Amino acid sequence: RRSSDLVAINTKCKGYRIFKALFFVPTVFPLTAVGLMWYFIFMPTGSFNSLLEVIGLSDLVMPWLVDPATAMNTIVFVNVWAGVGYYMVIILAGLTTIPDDVYEAAAIDGATSIQKFFKITVPMLKPILAMCILMDIIGSVKVFDLVFAMTGGGPNGLTNLPTTLMYNEAFKYNHYGVGSAIGIDRKSV
């Protein structure tokens, strides 16, 4: 497919605008609200465990945010869910910059859709994908509100990030010097 075809899907497919809006909406919400919403969903008596029971997957019911094996993965999932719409818009904008001539030349040479994707689309989006990855890494380092709203750094400090550790040391345990040192160390990074 040509890049214009990929972008033009929004006018050809039914429900694409709703799909795009549903993907982008989480980006607009404050991370504290997102964290609290998912906290209630992943509670032991929350809607996710209830759904698992209803569809017959009772063996998978667990305290997602309390179990050390699943707490960090659950937070990562929520963080990805909250940010995927932002990167979707950036990548869609990048798709519009790929010239149609390249895809037409590949079609004449007999390239399949998969070959076009991996040999044309991905390489031409590489700078945009690299920027998205860099922005996500920087954003992940400074996450506080999502982790604080969902676990507060628990269980047993397993989901502590430098920001939540700094907050807990300074304001929960009244170790102001340690909290300040963590903040200064974070500033130098």
Positions of the model-derived regions?
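A structural signal for multi-pass alpha-helical bundles of membrane permease subunits
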Residues: 1-188
